[in-house]
Protein backbone atom coordinates (compact mmCIF):
# COMPACT_ATOMS: atom_id res chain seq x y z
CA UNK A 1 0.00 0.00 0.00
CA UNK A 2 2.86 2.39 0.78
CA UNK A 3 4.33 1.98 -2.68
CA UNK A 4 0.91 2.71 -4.21
CA UNK A 5 0.84 5.89 -2.15
CA UNK A 6 4.13 6.94 -3.78
CA UNK A 7 6.85 5.70 -1.45
CA UNK A 8 9.95 4.58 -3.38
CA UNK A 9 11.39 2.41 -0.61
CA UNK A 10 9.73 0.77 2.37
CA UNK A 11 11.92 -0.16 5.32
CA UNK A 12 11.15 -1.79 8.65
CA UNK A 13 12.54 -0.23 11.83
CA UNK A 14 13.33 -3.64 13.37
CA UNK A 15 16.97 -3.37 12.27
CA UNK A 16 17.19 0.06 13.89
CA UNK A 17 15.59 -1.36 17.06
CA UNK A 18 18.41 -3.92 17.10
CA UNK A 19 20.96 -1.10 16.89
CA UNK A 20 19.20 0.85 19.63
CA UNK A 21 19.15 -2.11 21.99
CA UNK A 22 22.81 -2.91 21.24
CA UNK A 23 23.71 0.68 22.09
CA UNK A 24 21.59 0.68 25.25
CA UNK A 25 23.04 -2.69 26.29
CA UNK A 26 26.60 -1.46 25.74
CA UNK A 27 25.88 1.70 27.69
CA UNK A 28 24.43 -0.34 30.58
CA UNK A 29 27.45 -2.67 30.65
CA UNK A 30 29.80 0.32 30.59
CA UNK A 31 28.00 2.01 33.48
CA UNK A 32 27.87 -1.22 35.53
CA UNK A 33 31.56 -1.94 34.88
CA UNK A 34 32.57 1.56 35.94
CA UNK A 35 30.38 1.32 39.05
CA UNK A 36 31.80 -2.07 40.03
CA UNK A 37 35.33 -0.67 39.63
CA UNK A 38 34.53 1.96 42.25
CA UNK A 39 33.27 4.90 40.19
CA UNK A 40 30.45 6.07 42.45
CA UNK A 41 29.59 8.97 40.13
CA UNK A 42 28.13 6.61 37.53
CA UNK A 43 24.40 7.12 37.11
CA UNK A 44 22.33 4.05 37.80
CA UNK A 45 19.74 2.93 37.03
CA UNK A 46 19.80 3.53 33.30
CA UNK A 47 16.40 4.26 31.81
CA UNK A 48 15.44 3.75 28.18
CA UNK A 49 15.07 6.89 26.10
CA UNK A 50 13.10 5.61 23.12
CA UNK A 51 9.71 7.03 24.11
CA UNK A 52 9.60 10.74 23.26
CA UNK A 53 6.60 11.40 25.52
CA UNK A 54 8.46 9.91 28.47
CA UNK A 55 11.67 11.80 27.56
CA UNK A 56 9.73 15.08 27.38
CA UNK A 57 8.10 14.37 30.76
CA UNK A 58 11.46 13.47 32.32
CA UNK A 59 13.18 16.58 30.92
CA UNK A 60 10.51 18.86 32.37
CA UNK A 61 9.94 17.12 35.69
CA UNK A 62 13.48 16.01 36.53
CA UNK A 63 15.91 18.42 34.83
CA UNK A 64 18.55 17.67 37.46
CA UNK A 65 18.61 13.96 36.54
CA UNK A 66 19.12 14.12 32.76
CA UNK A 67 22.22 11.90 32.94
CA UNK A 68 20.11 8.87 33.95
CA UNK A 69 18.34 8.08 30.64
CA UNK A 70 20.25 6.23 27.97
CA UNK A 71 21.87 8.33 25.28
CA UNK A 72 20.70 5.86 22.60
CA UNK A 73 18.32 7.14 19.95
CA UNK A 74 14.91 5.59 19.49
CA UNK A 75 14.55 3.14 16.58
CA UNK A 76 12.76 5.86 14.60
CA UNK A 77 15.64 8.28 15.01
CA UNK A 78 18.30 5.60 14.69
CA UNK A 79 16.86 4.57 11.33
CA UNK A 80 16.47 8.16 10.17
CA UNK A 81 20.15 8.83 10.89
CA UNK A 82 21.18 5.64 9.05
CA UNK A 83 18.96 6.46 6.08
CA UNK A 84 20.05 10.09 5.78
CA UNK A 85 23.75 9.35 6.24
CA UNK A 86 24.92 5.82 5.44
CA UNK A 87 22.18 4.73 3.03
CA UNK A 88 21.96 8.08 1.19
CA UNK A 89 25.72 8.05 0.66
CA UNK A 90 25.63 4.42 -0.48
CA UNK A 91 22.87 5.28 -3.01
CA UNK A 92 24.63 8.51 -4.03
CA UNK A 93 21.65 10.61 -2.96
CA UNK A 94 22.31 13.97 -1.30
CA UNK A 95 21.08 13.82 2.29
CA UNK A 96 18.81 16.82 1.84
CA UNK A 97 17.12 15.20 -1.20
CA UNK A 98 16.02 12.16 0.79
CA UNK A 99 12.65 12.41 2.54
CA UNK A 100 12.26 9.98 5.43
CA UNK A 101 8.72 9.31 6.64
CA UNK A 102 8.07 7.06 9.62
CA UNK A 103 4.81 5.31 10.36
CA UNK A 104 4.36 5.12 14.11
CA UNK A 105 1.46 4.42 16.47
CA UNK A 106 2.35 7.26 18.84
CA UNK A 107 1.74 10.94 18.10
CA UNK A 108 4.72 11.90 20.28
CA UNK A 109 6.96 10.61 17.47
CA UNK A 110 6.01 13.78 15.55
CA UNK A 111 7.55 15.86 18.33
CA UNK A 112 10.59 13.59 18.45
CA UNK A 113 11.50 13.97 14.78
CA UNK A 114 11.26 17.76 15.13
CA UNK A 115 13.84 17.90 17.94
CA UNK A 116 16.89 19.97 17.05
CA UNK A 117 19.41 17.30 18.11
CA UNK A 118 17.99 14.94 15.46
CA UNK A 119 18.95 17.16 12.52
CA UNK A 120 22.13 17.87 10.60
CA UNK A 121 22.54 21.46 9.43
CA UNK A 122 18.79 21.98 9.74
CA UNK A 123 17.89 18.82 7.80
CA UNK A 124 15.95 16.43 10.08
CA UNK A 125 16.90 12.75 10.15
CA UNK A 126 13.17 11.96 9.96
CA UNK A 127 11.22 14.52 7.95
CA UNK A 128 7.72 13.38 8.86
CA UNK A 129 6.08 10.96 11.24
CA UNK A 130 2.62 9.73 10.29
CA UNK A 131 0.43 8.05 12.85
CA UNK A 132 -1.02 4.69 11.92
CA UNK A 133 -4.43 6.37 11.93
CA UNK A 134 -3.21 8.99 9.43
CA UNK A 135 -1.81 6.23 7.23
CA UNK A 136 -5.12 4.35 7.34
CA UNK A 137 -6.89 7.55 6.27
CA UNK A 138 -4.48 8.04 3.34
CA UNK A 139 -4.98 4.44 2.23
CA UNK A 140 -8.75 4.84 2.44
CA UNK A 141 -8.69 8.11 0.46
CA UNK A 142 -6.54 6.45 -2.21
CA UNK A 143 -9.10 3.60 -2.49
CA UNK A 144 -6.44 0.96 -1.95
CA UNK A 145 -7.99 -2.48 -1.43
CA UNK A 146 -5.80 -4.53 0.92
CA UNK A 147 -7.40 -7.78 -0.21
CA UNK A 148 -6.16 -7.23 -3.76
CA UNK A 149 -2.58 -6.31 -2.81
CA UNK A 150 0.19 -8.77 -3.58
CA UNK A 151 2.48 -9.70 -0.69
CA UNK A 152 5.70 -7.68 -0.70
CA UNK A 153 8.84 -7.72 1.39
CA UNK A 154 10.39 -4.68 2.97
CA UNK A 155 13.48 -3.23 1.35
CA UNK A 156 16.56 -4.24 3.35
CA UNK A 157 19.13 -1.44 3.43
CA UNK A 158 21.41 -3.14 5.96
CA UNK A 159 20.32 -6.77 6.15
CA UNK A 160 17.93 -8.73 8.30
CA UNK A 161 16.94 -7.90 11.85
CA UNK A 162 16.81 -10.17 14.88
CA UNK A 163 13.82 -11.19 16.94
CA UNK A 164 14.85 -8.65 19.56
CA UNK A 165 13.82 -5.80 17.27
CA UNK A 166 10.41 -7.35 16.68
CA UNK A 167 9.46 -7.35 20.39
CA UNK A 168 10.89 -3.88 21.05
CA UNK A 169 7.55 -2.06 20.96
CA UNK A 170 5.68 -4.48 23.23
CA UNK A 171 5.38 -3.87 26.95
CA UNK A 172 8.60 -5.18 28.50
CA UNK A 173 10.08 -5.65 25.04
CA UNK A 174 13.06 -3.35 25.52
CA UNK A 175 14.16 -5.22 28.65
CA UNK A 176 13.66 -8.60 27.00
CA UNK A 177 15.56 -7.43 23.92
CA UNK A 178 18.41 -6.19 26.16
CA UNK A 179 18.58 -9.54 27.93
CA UNK A 180 18.59 -11.39 24.59
CA UNK A 181 21.35 -9.17 23.27
Task: Please state what every model-predicted region is.
Residues 1-181:
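Iron-sulfur-associated redox domains of electron-transfer enzymes in respiratory
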Amino acid sequence: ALRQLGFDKVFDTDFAADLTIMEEGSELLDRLTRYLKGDKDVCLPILTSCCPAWVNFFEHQFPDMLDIPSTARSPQQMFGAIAKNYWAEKMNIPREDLIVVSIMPCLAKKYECAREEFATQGDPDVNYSLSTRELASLIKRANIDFNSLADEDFDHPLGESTGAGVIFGASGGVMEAALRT
